[in-house]
Protein backbone atom coordinates (compact mmCIF):
# COMPACT_ATOMS: atom_id res chain seq x y z
CA UNK A 1 0.00 0.00 0.00
CA UNK A 2 2.72 2.46 0.98
CA UNK A 3 4.76 1.64 -2.12
CA UNK A 4 1.70 2.26 -4.30
CA UNK A 5 1.04 5.62 -2.64
CA UNK A 6 4.71 6.58 -2.96
CA UNK A 7 4.54 5.74 -6.67
CA UNK A 8 1.40 7.87 -7.03
CA UNK A 9 3.04 10.80 -5.26
CA UNK A 10 6.09 10.47 -7.52
CA UNK A 11 3.82 10.48 -10.56
CA UNK A 12 1.98 13.67 -9.55
CA UNK A 13 5.29 15.44 -8.88
CA UNK A 14 6.49 14.46 -12.35
CA UNK A 15 3.14 15.50 -13.84
CA UNK A 16 3.38 18.96 -12.32
CA UNK A 17 6.97 19.33 -13.54
CA UNK A 18 5.88 18.39 -17.07
CA UNK A 19 2.95 20.81 -17.00
CA UNK A 20 5.29 23.52 -15.71
CA UNK A 21 7.69 22.85 -18.59
CA UNK A 22 4.79 22.90 -21.06
CA UNK A 23 3.62 26.28 -19.72
CA UNK A 24 7.15 27.67 -20.09
CA UNK A 25 7.31 26.56 -23.74
CA UNK A 26 3.88 28.09 -24.38
CA UNK A 27 5.17 31.39 -22.97
CA UNK A 28 8.17 31.20 -25.32
CA UNK A 29 5.94 30.71 -28.38
CA UNK A 30 3.35 33.29 -27.27
CA UNK A 31 5.30 36.11 -28.93
CA UNK A 32 4.57 34.57 -32.35
CA UNK A 33 1.51 32.33 -32.01
CA UNK A 34 -1.91 33.36 -30.71
CA UNK A 35 -3.46 31.47 -27.76
CA UNK A 36 -5.75 29.64 -30.21
CA UNK A 37 -2.79 28.48 -32.30
CA UNK A 38 -0.97 27.26 -29.20
CA UNK A 39 -4.07 25.28 -28.21
CA UNK A 40 -4.15 23.68 -31.66
CA UNK A 41 -0.46 22.83 -31.81
CA UNK A 42 -0.44 21.48 -28.26
CA UNK A 43 -3.51 19.34 -28.97
CA UNK A 44 -2.57 18.02 -32.42
CA UNK A 45 0.90 17.01 -31.22
CA UNK A 46 -0.66 15.24 -28.25
CA UNK A 47 -3.18 13.49 -30.52
CA UNK A 48 -0.44 12.20 -32.82
CA UNK A 49 1.63 10.96 -29.88
CA UNK A 50 -1.36 9.15 -28.37
CA UNK A 51 -2.18 7.51 -31.71
CA UNK A 52 1.44 6.34 -32.02
CA UNK A 53 1.31 4.82 -28.53
CA UNK A 54 -2.09 3.16 -29.00
CA UNK A 55 -0.94 0.06 -31.00
CA UNK A 56 1.56 -0.78 -28.25
CA UNK A 57 -0.88 -0.17 -25.40
CA UNK A 58 -4.45 -0.45 -26.73
CA UNK A 59 -7.51 0.40 -24.67
CA UNK A 60 -11.27 0.44 -25.16
CA UNK A 61 -12.40 3.38 -27.28
CA UNK A 62 -16.14 2.67 -27.22
CA UNK A 63 -18.25 3.67 -24.26
CA UNK A 64 -19.19 1.09 -21.64
CA UNK A 65 -22.81 2.18 -21.86
CA UNK A 66 -24.99 4.72 -23.67
CA UNK A 67 -25.40 8.31 -22.58
CA UNK A 68 -21.80 9.39 -22.17
CA UNK A 69 -21.16 11.25 -25.44
CA UNK A 70 -22.77 14.53 -24.35
CA UNK A 71 -20.78 14.46 -21.11
CA UNK A 72 -17.59 13.78 -23.07
CA UNK A 73 -18.33 16.62 -25.50
CA UNK A 74 -18.98 18.97 -22.58
CA UNK A 75 -15.66 17.94 -21.00
CA UNK A 76 -13.84 18.67 -24.28
CA UNK A 77 -15.44 22.11 -24.60
CA UNK A 78 -14.90 23.29 -21.00
CA UNK A 79 -11.41 21.77 -20.89
CA UNK A 80 -10.55 23.52 -24.13
CA UNK A 81 -11.90 26.86 -22.90
CA UNK A 82 -9.86 26.45 -19.71
CA UNK A 83 -6.72 25.82 -21.77
CA UNK A 84 -7.45 28.78 -24.06
CA UNK A 85 -7.95 31.18 -21.14
CA UNK A 86 -4.82 29.83 -19.41
CA UNK A 87 -2.69 30.20 -22.56
CA UNK A 88 -3.94 33.77 -23.00
CA UNK A 89 -2.83 34.68 -19.49
CA UNK A 90 0.53 32.94 -19.93
CA UNK A 91 1.19 35.42 -22.73
CA UNK A 92 0.00 38.52 -20.87
CA UNK A 93 0.99 38.08 -17.21
CA UNK A 94 3.57 36.24 -15.13
CA UNK A 95 3.59 32.46 -15.32
CA UNK A 96 3.14 32.18 -11.54
CA UNK A 97 0.01 34.37 -11.50
CA UNK A 98 -1.49 32.65 -14.55
CA UNK A 99 -0.90 29.26 -12.92
CA UNK A 100 -2.35 30.46 -9.60
CA UNK A 101 -5.55 31.57 -11.37
CA UNK A 102 -5.83 28.15 -13.02
CA UNK A 103 -5.14 26.30 -9.77
CA UNK A 104 -8.18 27.96 -8.16
CA UNK A 105 -10.30 25.14 -9.61
CA UNK A 106 -10.89 23.36 -6.24
CA UNK A 107 -12.30 26.61 -4.85
CA UNK A 108 -14.88 26.81 -7.63
CA UNK A 109 -15.55 23.07 -7.38
CA UNK A 110 -16.60 23.56 -3.75
CA UNK A 111 -18.97 26.35 -4.77
CA UNK A 112 -20.36 24.66 -7.90
CA UNK A 113 -20.79 21.10 -6.60
CA UNK A 114 -23.95 21.91 -4.57
CA UNK A 115 -25.52 23.40 -7.70
CA UNK A 116 -24.42 20.82 -10.26
CA UNK A 117 -24.07 17.64 -8.20
CA UNK A 118 -26.55 18.44 -5.42
CA UNK A 119 -23.79 17.80 -2.88
CA UNK A 120 -24.11 19.23 0.61
CA UNK A 121 -21.77 22.17 1.18
CA UNK A 122 -19.84 21.78 4.42
CA UNK A 123 -19.12 24.89 6.48
CA UNK A 124 -15.38 24.13 6.62
CA UNK A 125 -15.21 23.80 2.82
CA UNK A 126 -17.11 27.08 2.39
CA UNK A 127 -14.71 28.90 4.74
CA UNK A 128 -11.74 27.43 2.86
CA UNK A 129 -13.23 28.52 -0.47
CA UNK A 130 -13.77 32.05 0.86
CA UNK A 131 -10.10 32.21 1.89
CA UNK A 132 -9.18 31.22 -1.65
CA UNK A 133 -11.47 33.87 -3.12
CA UNK A 134 -9.68 36.51 -1.03
CA UNK A 135 -6.46 35.23 -2.62
CA UNK A 136 -8.01 35.60 -6.07
CA UNK A 137 -8.94 39.21 -5.26
CA UNK A 138 -5.37 39.95 -4.14
CA UNK A 139 -3.77 38.62 -7.34
CA UNK A 140 -6.43 40.43 -9.40
CA UNK A 141 -5.00 43.86 -8.61
CA UNK A 142 -4.82 45.89 -11.87
CA UNK A 143 -1.97 47.97 -10.42
CA UNK A 144 0.24 44.88 -10.25
CA UNK A 145 2.25 43.49 -13.22
CA UNK A 146 -0.22 44.54 -15.94
CA UNK A 147 -3.09 42.42 -14.65
CA UNK A 148 -5.96 44.14 -16.44
CA UNK A 149 -9.68 43.41 -16.51
CA UNK A 150 -9.36 40.96 -19.42
CA UNK A 151 -6.58 39.03 -17.65
CA UNK A 152 -8.64 38.87 -14.45
CA UNK A 153 -11.70 37.58 -16.34
CA UNK A 154 -9.58 35.03 -18.22
CA UNK A 155 -7.95 33.91 -14.98
CA UNK A 156 -11.26 33.40 -13.21
CA UNK A 157 -12.73 31.62 -16.23
CA UNK A 158 -9.71 29.30 -16.51
CA UNK A 159 -10.28 28.17 -12.92
CA UNK A 160 -14.05 27.79 -13.36
CA UNK A 161 -13.69 25.79 -16.59
CA UNK A 162 -11.07 23.50 -15.03
CA UNK A 163 -13.47 23.00 -12.13
CA UNK A 164 -16.30 22.05 -14.52
CA UNK A 165 -13.96 19.64 -16.33
CA UNK A 166 -13.06 17.95 -13.02
CA UNK A 167 -16.73 17.66 -12.03
CA UNK A 168 -17.55 16.10 -15.42
CA UNK A 169 -14.69 13.60 -15.11
CA UNK A 170 -16.40 12.02 -12.11
CA UNK A 171 -19.31 10.93 -14.32
CA UNK A 172 -17.18 9.96 -17.32
CA UNK A 173 -15.52 7.15 -15.37
CA UNK A 174 -18.75 5.18 -15.74
CA UNK A 175 -18.77 5.55 -19.54
CA UNK A 176 -15.22 5.58 -20.92
CA UNK A 177 -11.70 4.32 -20.30
CA UNK A 178 -9.49 7.08 -18.87
CA UNK A 179 -7.10 6.91 -21.81
CA UNK A 180 -10.00 7.21 -24.25
CA UNK A 181 -11.09 10.40 -22.49
CA UNK A 182 -7.57 11.83 -22.86
CA UNK A 183 -7.50 10.97 -26.58
CA UNK A 184 -10.98 12.40 -27.14
CA UNK A 185 -9.96 15.61 -25.38
CA UNK A 186 -6.80 15.97 -27.47
CA UNK A 187 -8.62 15.22 -30.74
CA UNK A 188 -11.57 17.47 -29.91
CA UNK A 189 -9.29 20.35 -29.00
CA UNK A 190 -7.34 19.86 -32.22
CA UNK A 191 -10.57 20.36 -34.20
CA UNK A 192 -11.73 23.33 -32.12
CA UNK A 193 -8.28 24.93 -32.24
CA UNK A 194 -8.02 24.42 -36.01
CA UNK A 195 -11.43 26.00 -36.61
CA UNK A 196 -10.69 28.85 -34.19
CA UNK A 197 -7.44 29.74 -35.96
CA UNK A 198 -9.41 30.87 -39.02
CA UNK A 199 -11.80 33.05 -37.01
CA UNK A 200 -10.77 36.52 -35.85
CA UNK A 201 -11.46 36.46 -32.10
CA UNK A 202 -10.21 39.49 -30.12
CA UNK A 203 -7.39 38.61 -27.71
CA UNK A 204 -7.48 34.91 -28.62
CA UNK A 205 -7.08 34.38 -32.36
CA UNK A 206 -5.19 36.64 -34.78
CA UNK A 207 -5.01 34.47 -37.89
CA UNK A 208 -2.67 31.70 -38.96
CA UNK A 209 1.10 32.06 -38.50
CA UNK A 210 3.17 29.52 -40.40
CA UNK A 211 5.58 27.80 -37.97
CA UNK A 212 9.22 28.76 -38.48
CA UNK A 213 12.05 26.23 -38.20
CA UNK A 214 12.71 27.04 -34.55
CA UNK A 215 8.99 26.83 -33.77
CA UNK A 216 8.85 23.15 -34.76
CA UNK A 217 11.03 22.32 -31.74
CA UNK A 218 8.90 24.36 -29.31
CA UNK A 219 5.64 22.93 -30.70
CA UNK A 220 6.98 19.39 -30.33
CA UNK A 221 8.17 20.03 -26.78
CA UNK A 222 4.79 21.55 -25.81
CA UNK A 223 3.03 18.43 -27.07
CA UNK A 224 5.50 15.98 -25.53
CA UNK A 225 5.58 17.64 -22.10
CA UNK A 226 1.79 18.04 -22.09
CA UNK A 227 1.26 14.39 -23.04
CA UNK A 228 3.73 13.14 -20.43
CA UNK A 229 2.08 15.37 -17.83
CA UNK A 230 -1.34 13.93 -18.66
CA UNK A 231 -0.06 10.36 -18.45
CA UNK A 232 1.74 10.94 -15.15
CA UNK A 233 -1.40 12.64 -13.79
CA UNK A 234 -3.55 9.67 -14.80
CA UNK A 235 -1.18 7.15 -13.22
CA UNK A 236 -0.97 9.26 -10.05
CA UNK A 237 -4.74 9.10 -9.49
CA UNK A 238 -4.80 5.42 -10.47
CA UNK A 239 -2.19 4.44 -7.88
CA UNK A 240 -2.90 6.71 -4.92
CA UNK A 241 -6.05 8.12 -3.30
CA UNK A 242 -7.23 11.48 -4.63
CA UNK A 243 -7.16 12.85 -1.09
CA UNK A 244 -3.38 12.45 -1.01
CA UNK A 245 -2.70 13.44 -4.62
CA UNK A 246 -4.85 16.60 -4.83
CA UNK A 247 -2.88 18.75 -2.33
CA UNK A 248 0.39 17.98 -4.12
CA UNK A 249 -1.01 19.41 -7.37
CA UNK A 250 -0.35 22.86 -5.96
CA UNK A 251 3.38 22.38 -6.57
CA UNK A 252 2.47 23.43 -10.11
CA UNK A 253 2.39 27.04 -8.88
CA UNK A 254 5.97 26.66 -7.62
CA UNK A 255 7.11 25.48 -11.06
CA UNK A 256 5.22 28.38 -12.62
CA UNK A 257 7.11 30.79 -10.39
CA UNK A 258 10.54 29.22 -11.05
CA UNK A 259 10.14 28.87 -14.82
CA UNK A 260 8.60 32.34 -15.01
CA UNK A 261 11.56 33.91 -13.24
CA UNK A 262 13.92 32.06 -15.58
CA UNK A 263 12.06 33.46 -18.60
CA UNK A 264 12.19 37.02 -17.28
CA UNK A 265 9.10 37.46 -15.09
CA UNK A 266 9.56 39.81 -12.15
CA UNK A 267 9.23 38.36 -8.67
CA UNK A 268 5.75 38.67 -7.19
CA UNK A 269 5.20 41.65 -4.92
CA UNK A 270 3.97 41.26 -1.34
CA UNK A 271 0.28 41.59 -2.23
CA UNK A 272 0.40 39.03 -5.05
CA UNK A 273 2.55 36.68 -2.96
CA UNK A 274 -0.03 36.83 -0.18
CA UNK A 275 -2.78 36.11 -2.71
CA UNK A 276 -0.95 33.04 -4.04
CA UNK A 277 -0.30 31.89 -0.46
CA UNK A 278 -4.02 32.17 0.39
CA UNK A 279 -4.95 30.18 -2.73
CA UNK A 280 -2.45 27.50 -1.71
CA UNK A 281 -3.80 27.42 1.85
CA UNK A 282 -7.37 27.30 0.59
CA UNK A 283 -6.66 24.32 -1.65
CA UNK A 284 -4.82 22.47 1.09
CA UNK A 285 -7.64 23.12 3.58
CA UNK A 286 -10.22 21.87 1.08
CA UNK A 287 -8.19 18.68 0.55
CA UNK A 288 -7.24 18.25 4.23
CA UNK A 289 -10.22 16.10 5.37
CA UNK A 290 -9.70 13.63 2.52
CA UNK A 291 -5.94 13.64 3.11
CA UNK A 292 -6.30 12.82 6.81
CA UNK A 293 -8.85 10.12 6.03
CA UNK A 294 -6.50 8.41 3.57
CA UNK A 295 -3.46 8.72 5.83
CA UNK A 296 -5.33 6.89 8.61
CA UNK A 297 -5.76 3.92 6.26
CA UNK A 298 -2.01 3.53 5.73
Curated annotation (Swiss-Prot):
Pfam family, one: EamA
GO cellular component: plasma membrane
Subcellular location as annotated: Cell membrane
Gene3D superfamilies cross-referenced by the UniProt entry: 1.10.3730.20
Domain of life of the native organism: Bacteria
Record keyword Cytoplasm present: no
Alphabetically ordered keywords of this record: Cell membrane, Membrane, Repeat, Transmembrane, Transmembrane helix, Transport
Membrane topology value: Multi-pass membrane protein
Transmembrane segments: 5-25, 36-56, 76-96, 97-117, 124-144, 147-167, 181-201, 216-236, 244-264, 272-292
Residue ranges of every copy of the EamA domain listed in the record: 17-141, 183-288
Family, as annotated: Belongs to the EamA transporter family.
Protein name: Uncharacterized transporter jhp_1155
Origin species: Helicobacter pylori (strain J99 / ATCC 700824)
Higher taxonomy: Bacteria, Pseudomonadati, Campylobacterota, Epsilonproteobacteria, Campylobacterales
Amino acid sequence: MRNTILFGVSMILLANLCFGIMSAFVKITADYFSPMENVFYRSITMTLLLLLIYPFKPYRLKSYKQGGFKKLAFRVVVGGLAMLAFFYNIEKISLATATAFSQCAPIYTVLLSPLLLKEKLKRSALISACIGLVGVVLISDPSVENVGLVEIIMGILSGIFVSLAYITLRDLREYYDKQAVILAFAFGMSLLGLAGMFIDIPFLSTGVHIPRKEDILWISLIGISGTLGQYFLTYAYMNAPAGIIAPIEYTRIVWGLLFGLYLGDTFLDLKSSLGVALILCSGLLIALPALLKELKKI
